[in-house]
Regions:
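Binding-site signature for planar aromatic cofactors or substrates
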Residues: 1-213
Length: 213
């Protein structure tokens, strides 16, 4: 099969009335799309590409797991000293994009990013499996790795000890507060359906418009 034959190969039969009758609240629709992706057993439904920018305007992106999505925004975690953490400290705005190949849906959320307080970050850390907590405790994300075996051994020792693992002070939660949301549904004929919402800071109110493919 050619690469061309593998593109836009998902479900083209979804009924998505929001494109014809857009609701006023894009965040409720955002949660509906996320819940539907989970219900349809999409692979990695909460995996998203986070794009950040540094002070020189250089963009970087990476796939991560979104922990929660509600009316206040989207939660994710990172080390403050990582590339994304440094970017967000200097330019606290970002974009998260979900793509679900099985259903030909893409959801993009943009907006300012705020750092969660210690209590909220502790709660997020406590939800992680012990193995993930141990790796987080011994790692300094994005720093130079000199000895992989030694790093793994330190993480394994924490797991085997079975004691509670404390959240590293540098590991924190973030919330992306949406001020723009775009819903996209792909079509093999490239007549993709697009619905964009914007919430300007001056008004604080959502507006929406359909976009050409």
């Amino acid at each position: 099969m050619t690469a061309q034959g593998q593109t836009l190969s998902g479900d083209t039969t979804l009924v998505l009335p929001e494109f014809d009758t857009p609701p006023e609240d894009p965040l409720a629709l955002m949660r509906d799309w996320l819940d539907s992706a989970v219900a349809r057993e999409i692979r990695e439904p909460l995996a998203a590409v986070l794009a950040t920018v540094d002070t020189s305007g250089r963009v970087s992106s990476r796939v991560l797991l979104v922990k929660e999505a509600d009316a206040r925004g989207l939660l994710f975690t990172s080390f403050q000293g990582s590339r994304k953490g440094r970017d967000l400290a200097a330019s606290p705005t970002a974009s998260l994009t979900f793509y679900w190949r099985e259903t030909l849906q893409q959801l993009t959320v943009q907006g300012p990013v705020e750092v969660l307080d210690a209590g909220a970050s502790d709660d997020l850390f406590a939800r992680r499996p012990l193995e993930a907590q141990a790796t987080t405790a011994v790692s300094r994300q994005s720093r130079t790795l000199d000895d992989e075996a030694e790093l793994k051994a330190r993480a394994r020792a924490l797991v085997e000890a079975g004691d509670p693992v404390s959240r590293p002070a540098e590991w924190t939660g973030y919330r992306l507060v949406p001020d723009a949301v775009e819903f996209w549904y792909g079509s093999p004929d490239r007549l993709h359906r697009r619905l964009r919402y914007d919430r300007p800071a001056e008004t604080g109110s959502w507006s929406h418009r359909r976009l050409q493919p």
